Amino acid sequence: MSSFAIFGNPVSHSKSPKIYSMFANEFGMCGEYDLKVASDDNFYNLLYQFFDMGGFGANITVPFKKRAFLLCDNLTDRSILSSTVNTIKKQLDGTLLGDNTDGIGLINDLKRLNWISIDNAFIDMTCNNIQETANILLIGSGGAAQSIIPVLLDIKKCCVNIINRTFFNAQRLVQYYHSIGRQNISCIDLNNLLCEKNACKKYDLIINASSSSMNNDLPCISSFLITPFTKCYDLFYGNQDTIFVKWCKKNGSNYCVDGLGMLIEQAAYAFYLWHGKKPSVPIVLNAFRSELCK
């Protein structure tokens, strides 16, 4: 049995085994990594069995990130804030450490793109200088959004604004962060955002964390939000531009990216958590991008 695996349902499409193999090859390590199809009934038993039989590291994908959070003995601060776990490491004392590397993956990809600086400040694309303040529009309030909010709030002098079809869900998230002293987050009623005069508010970064791209649907936002310098990021990706990326380009943004870089970056941090070695992301990212474009 491999010492590393991904647990989820479905997982047959997962790129994690190949990503892990490429990272491992860089350091001359064994690249074995399994796919584990779990169900609601057997997830806990399957995961515990994996670690009992010598497993060392696990990735967790949908729909088990919240359940994985509940079974870990120790948790990183960012996983506690998001109440989700996507990476587990078996520690020397046998306990399980849970982390969520999604946010780190996003931030590192934004740094790779030179959208934010090394020290977590927004970069003004019009002059390539550090911005004094920045506004982020986050579309969605589900698991994908929750996993990245903690790191977004750490960007210097930024405010995160959430929109969601169900306004109550966005409100609940904002209230939670306000209760722990994080005041640089708010939510906007979708109807207000769609009004032309409100849509003229400047957003430096718009992130689609909703499932709309997976369903080939557009999120309900106005084209008035888009300027040539608006950075647009879709957490999802495909073998061509997502519908959100296409829409942002069509409406004038010169900075539109899908989530493939985030996927590779979060996997790189998981690898670092397990092995203490930082793999090279650009080589793997370029290989996967080329494969998707075939």
UniProtKB/Swiss-Prot annotation:
GO cellular component terms given for this protein: cytosol
Assigned EC number: 1.1.1.25
Statement: the UniProt record of this protein carries the keyword Cytoplasm: no
Active site location: 65 (proton acceptor)
GO MF term (any one): shikimate 3-dehydrogenase (NADP+) activity
Pathways per UniProt: Metabolic intermediate biosynthesis; chorismate biosynthesis; chorismate from D-erythrose 4-phosphate and phosphoenolpyruvate: step 4/7
Keywords carried by this UniProt record: Amino-acid biosynthesis, Aromatic amino acid biosynthesis, NADP, Oxidoreductase
Positions that bind NADP(+): 77, 140-144, 235, 259
InterPro entries reported in the protein's UniProt record: Aminoacid_DH-like_N_sf, NAD(P)-bd_dom_sf, SDH_C, Shikimate_DH, Shikimate_DH-bd_N, Shikimate_DH_fam, Shikm_DH/Glu-tRNA_Rdtase
UniProt-annotated binding residues for shikimate: 14-16, 61, 86, 102, 237
GO BP, one annotated term: aromatic amino acid family biosynthetic process
Keyword NADP: yes
Catalytic activity: shikimate + NADP(+) = 3-dehydroshikimate + NADPH + H(+)
Enzyme class name: oxidoreductase
Assembly and interaction partners: Homodimer.
Family in the record: Belongs to the shikimate dehydrogenase family.
Known role: Involved in the biosynthesis of the chorismate, which leads to the biosynthesis of aromatic amino acids. Catalyzes the reversible NADPH linked reduction of 3-dehydroshikimate (DHSA) to yield shikimate (SA).
This protein's name: Shikimate dehydrogenase (NADP(+))
Organism listed in the record: Blochmanniella floridana
Upper lineage: Bacteria, Pseudomonadati, Pseudomonadota, Gammaproteobacteria, Enterobacterales
